[in-house]
Swiss-Prot record:
<dbReference type="GO" id="GO:0009408">
    <property type="term" value="P:response to heat"/>
</dbReference>
<feature type="domain" description="sHSP">
    <location>
        <begin position="35"/>
        <end position="89"/>
    </location>
</feature>
<dbReference type="GO" id="GO:0051082">
    <property type="term" value="F:unfolded protein binding"/>
</dbReference>
<keyword id="KW-0346">Stress response</keyword>
<protein>
    <recommendedName>
        <fullName>Heat shock protein 30A</fullName>
    </recommendedName>
</protein>
<dbReference type="InterPro" id="IPR008978">
    <property type="entry name" value="HSP20-like_chaperone"/>
</dbReference>
<dbReference type="GO" id="GO:0042026">
    <property type="term" value="P:protein refolding"/>
</dbReference>
<dbReference type="Pfam" id="PF00011">
    <property type="entry name" value="HSP20"/>
</dbReference>
<feature type="compositionally biased region" description="Basic and acidic residues">
    <location>
        <begin position="19"/>
        <end position="39"/>
    </location>
</feature>
<feature type="compositionally biased region" description="Basic and acidic residues">
    <location>
        <begin position="1"/>
        <end position="11"/>
    </location>
</feature>
<dbReference type="GO" id="GO:0005737">
    <property type="term" value="C:cytoplasm"/>
</dbReference>
<dbReference type="InterPro" id="IPR001436">
    <property type="entry name" value="Alpha-crystallin/sHSP_animal"/>
</dbReference>
<comment type="similarity">
    <text>Belongs to the small heat shock protein (HSP20) family.</text>
</comment>
<dbReference type="InterPro" id="IPR002068">
    <property type="entry name" value="A-crystallin/Hsp20_dom"/>
</dbReference>
<dbReference type="GO" id="GO:0005634">
    <property type="term" value="C:nucleus"/>
</dbReference>
<feature type="region of interest" description="Disordered">
    <location>
        <begin position="1"/>
        <end position="55"/>
    </location>
</feature>
Length: 89
């Protein structure tokens, strides 16, 4: 009987841990959404037209020389390398 109670307690503890993790992820998602709305930016998006595909990415923090766009077969690969300057410079 004691093992049964211990197993149930483990399940309850695991459920609490997962719920806590889910709550934290929802909070972060809400903060990101509110931040985008206050900045007037939209999340990355794309749409498929009949003869073309259009994709919009937020690259505000990158300068043009930090971005690379390549095609590889039917794929479009966008990479960005952004060097942050330290406060000591």
């Amino acid at each position: 009987m004691r093992n049964n109670v211990e197993r149930r307690m483990q399940r309850v503890n695991e459920a609490c841990r997962l719920l806590s993790k889910d709550t934290e992820m929802r909070r972060i998602t809400d903060q990101n959404r509110q931040s985008r709305e206050s900045e007037g930016t939209s999340p990355n998006s794309g749409k498929d037209g009949k003869d073309h595909f259009e994709l919009t990415l937020n690259v505000r923090d990158f300068s043009p020389h930090e971005l690379t766009v390549k095609t590889q077969g039917r794929r479009v690969i966008v990479t960005g390398k952004h060097e942050r300057k330290s406060d000591t410079e």
